[in-house]
Amino acid sequence: MFRINRFQELLKFLPRSSFEGMVARHKADKHSKGFGCWDQLVAMLYAQLSGASSLRVLEAGFNSQRRHHYHLGVRAIKRTTLADANARRDPAVFEEAVRTLVAGVARSVRQQSQHLMYLLDSSPIALRGREFDHWTQDNKTGHTQGLKLHVLLNAHDQTPQWHSITAPNVNDLTEGQKVPIEPGARYVFDKGYCDYSWWHRIEQAQAFFVTRFKRNAKLHVVHSAPVSQADASWLISDEQVCLSNKHPRGGRINPYDKPLRRVIVRRQGYATALVLATNDLSSPASEIAQHYKQRWAIELFFKWIKQHLKIKRFLGRSANAVRLQILTALMAYLLLSLLNRAQGGKKTLWLLLAEVRESLFDRLQPDQAWSQRRRRHQQELLENQATLFG
């Protein structure tokens, strides 16, 4: 009896029929010359999951598994053909594939958690050297030459919900304002995203935010809540405040005329306190502080993908090839997250990646395959019920 391998198991979360629909919409295979977007996707995901360090290693490793190519729907690859596709092919199909996987993860998260909290941040991706300089020099900053990856992370399961790839000189706030706002959700970000007009839009969308006031914020206190003796060791003050500056920047009118909340907390090991800003006027101060503390999860996410997936050493040197490789890293992370959830979520993502890396072309054992199908069927039933009754 035929049994699928681990690689096929992962790809089931992005069915080829769905992917080919994306390819058709973008007419991405128009000049493919026998090496289509699906071949490119499988090859690049193999590079991410196997940890291939170069195109030569990718070609040798992937082509050594020829008996599995038919069931993956691909043929042996040539590194020159893959390099050419990475340099020239529009990444729009891969962008849409990431969004499709994000939607699949988001549906599952909504069933598991009533309270949505998102973490927003960016991380630089350094690209230096003669082969990168011709397209990275003009947009470099004092700290970074390369690109910047912006991510909105779901705090419940540390999966990306939105992303953007820009030059490093693009302001975080400029990209942050493109994030879709969900009513009832909570958005946590640092003071680099300080913009009262944007805060007002989040408030108008009936969502919440937790961030930090800048040092020069002009505020006047409307109400001070008493600090209990039990909280005095960490909480300095809990106040409702209003913004005093009606023209904060460039003569623009500040639209945020409602009270905000300022929670000032001590930081262990630091001389300065943390001055938090939020439009949540009812939650305990301890919860507000804890929400901001969870922002570190997105720092760990960036550290994880840079350490364990391929976004520090690149297989191509063009802007297009680098962007495609970052997108396939995000796809690999999302596929691993979906597989982990289908298996009950008992393993760390690092342990699962280590197992996948060592057994990428191993056939699943019969009991494994059966239990995977059963769990996936149960997950589909839950999703259908949520669609019907939600």
For each predicted feature, which ranges?
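Single, function-defining residue in the core of a domain
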Residues: 1-57, 87-89, 112-116, 120-131, ...
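DNA-recognition alpha helix
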Residues: 54-72
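Acidic/polar active-site rim loop that often engages polyanionic ligands
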Residues: 63, 81-82, 181
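A short structural micro-motif
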Residues: 65-68, 104, 311
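Active-site- or DNA-interface-adjacent structural scaffold in DNA-acting proteins
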Residues: 75-135
